[in-house]
């Protein structure tokens, strides 16, 4: 039986818990990234965090000593925006989220609105308001489709776990009887979109 060895040309890796943990560098991560860059390998760093834009995340990683260009960062916000662009180009959305998500949606030509949006999109935010959640519930009840950037129920913080997208999506789902479509990890869609973004493929 002959074994064929294929050369790995593209790497997808998790940011959280693989390269950094609560904004502290995991030992060896900087050497690994440097090695990929030195050998010309394509790579994308993946994160379910939708708060920050890739530029913001690149700056935050640089503070830990990790030099990752913004074009090598793929967030659940980017994956969500690309997914919605394929489903309904130039659509509209009501967003519970921050700059990472709103910027990604604007970049694909989406209009953000509270009036009769095509989608309600729930992402990470450090301040979920009762008013915004209530608005989301009413819009979904009126027919807007329900999308969430990722299913993670909690996220890390220096003080301990805090509620994240999955928990808030569950609250809205309970109130509406509508389950969201989760775009981020572990949905393979996020990985496929990432590979497409750097023009690679999986085998």
Protein language model features and the residues they cover:
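HAD-like aspartate-dependent phosphatase fold
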Residues: 2-15, 19-203
């Amino acid at each position: 039986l002959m074994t064929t060895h294929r050369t790995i040309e593209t790497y997808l890796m998790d940011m959280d818990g693989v390269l950094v943990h609560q904004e502290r560098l995991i030992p060896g991560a900087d050497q690994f990234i440097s090695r990929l860059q030195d050998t010309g390998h394509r790579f994308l760093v993946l994160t379910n965090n939708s708060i920050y834009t890739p530029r913001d995340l690149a700056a935050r990683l640089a503070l830990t000593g990790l030099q990752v260009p913004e074009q090598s960062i793929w967030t659940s916000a980017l994956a969500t925006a690309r997914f919605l662009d394929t489903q309904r180009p130039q659509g509209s959305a009501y967003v519970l989220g921050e700059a990472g998500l709103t910027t990604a949606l604007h970049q694909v030509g989406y209009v953000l609105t509270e009036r009769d949006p095509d989608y309600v999109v729930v992402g990470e935010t450090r301040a979920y308001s009762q008013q915004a959640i209530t608005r989301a519930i009413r819009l979904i009840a009126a027919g807007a489709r329900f999308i969430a950037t990722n299913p993670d129920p909690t996220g890390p913080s220096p003080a301990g776990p805090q509620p994240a997208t999955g928990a808030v999506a569950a609250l809205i789902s309970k109130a509406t009887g509508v389950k969201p479509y989760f775009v981020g990890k572990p949905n393979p869609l996020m990985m496929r979109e990432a590979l497409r973004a750097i023009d690679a493929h999986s085998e």
